[in-house]
């Protein structure tokens, strides 16, 4: 049963957003239903955050969090891997692919995962990731549930593409799609913008919104039904990463941690990656732009840099603990952005400078609400080939070079 106009007015009045129905009388039936659906699914309680913007940005006391380094991992590889394989065979591990983005920065109008990195034959980003996951499926002789998070913009294209390619050999019964929730975009007073007469201006709810999006899309029913206890969440733009890596899973389980985070040794103290740390004694990530010179040059007891391990957006979460933090409110990040909007005359304006706020929740806040986290070092040139740009650093070019180095035929 969808929301009625009266219910929508009631909800809007509660948050002082009645203006979004200004053009309701001009809309056709389909558009009316569209805006009512949007009003129903939009979390407006977050708009209160504008009033407390300053409190949200405060960081606590930052101290180092030691990573499990390669030598310790190698010494225990067999044991860790056996534990991880056992968990996979028991159906306790699932993977979540964050694939809501478009390939815009690569000059493509398609979903990011549809980008072709091949040279002599087609090799798509989705294909690279599924191939990597298939290696574990063969190793464990067991299928792993793969949840794919799409967005409003790319959902249909993503599903059609993967079906057309027969999921690159993956068992379709183990692939589940869900859409990332959207958060409203507002002016500086916290009033929601309209992007069309029948459409609120919205943007994805940040990389920390994936679990609540799973929940609201009914995916947790599958998680509970299948007895899934661990979720490995990873981003679409790193074509070399190991997914549902048994050694990583086993190490996290054996160390009794509720989160594992794959990390790489930084290639320079000022490299633009977030760094694992403790904040007020709890696991956290300090973003590269928050690292002071003092932190950047701090040393641990061995004389090594204390904040030396960058995160690569590949995390293993314990489901039970994720559900616990979902009962609490996730902290919000308020980001100033340029937001296209309808002006008083109903004309679309595309601003050249920031004119409002978008609201995001971030993975680092999920980690900070957890009691323990294992930073797990991986070899950079074997597991980290991010594609953020067309050329240069972290680009299609650099990823092709790394794929070739790792024996992938392009």
Question: Each predicted region: which residue ranges?
Answer:
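Short acidic, glycine/serine/threonine-rich loops at helix termini
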Residues: 107-110, 157-163, 187-192, 243-247, ...
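N-terminal glycine-rich, Lys/His-bearing helix-loop that initiates the first secondary-structure elements
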Residues: 1-3
